[in-house]
Amino acid sequence: PVPDSSFLRDP
């Protein structure tokens, strides 16, 4: 499954 890409976004 595709991992959550939320960590790719800047804070």
Swiss-Prot record:
The keyword Secreted applies. It comes from the Eukaryota. GO terms for cellular component: extracellular region. GO terms for biological process: neuropeptide signaling pathway. Keywords: Neuropeptide, Secreted. Transmembrane segments: none annotated. Its main location: secreted. It is found in: Secreted. Belongs to the FARP (FMRF amide related peptide) family. FMRFamides and FMRFamide-like peptides are neuropeptides. This is Extended FMRFamide-10. It comes from Striatophasma naukluftense (Gladiator).
